């Protein structure tokens, strides 16, 4: 469907299960943000790609040099950014894997327990998201070292400098 030279990342949804493999949520995407990203402007601010259900082609793999100057927040997120900046990010709305949620997971599916903790201590949530914004901006700066289109460059520059606006 797509020429080989087009960088592609294809990903799917996951079912969230507990430690005993009981289904907790039929869709991880719907527990996270209720949408799956396919565009750069979405992916800059939020990653919806989980590496275990992602497939990439050689054209996308070749874009990742391993010589990035800025820290990568998450490898699957960076690959999704590359796909949206240079090719296609494709979502298939079908769970293809069980995501086992442990009670001590740091990342992963959002649970009621995590949400209650955030309501009780909003300052911790604020600090966490502030750090996430700064880290995602740092990660996105790597794209500016690559030959992106002028339109894509403008989107990325606006994103990485948005906190600098007085």
Placement of each model-derived feature along the sequence:
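Secondary-structure boundary motif
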Residues: 2-4, 66, 85, 145
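C-terminal subregions of glycosyltransferases and related glycan-biosynthesis enzymes
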Residues: 3, 43, 71-73, 78, ...
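Conserved donor NDP-sugar-binding/catalytic core segment of glycosyltransferases
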Residues: 1-25
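Conserved nucleotide-sugar donor-binding catalytic segment
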Residues: 12, 26, 30-112
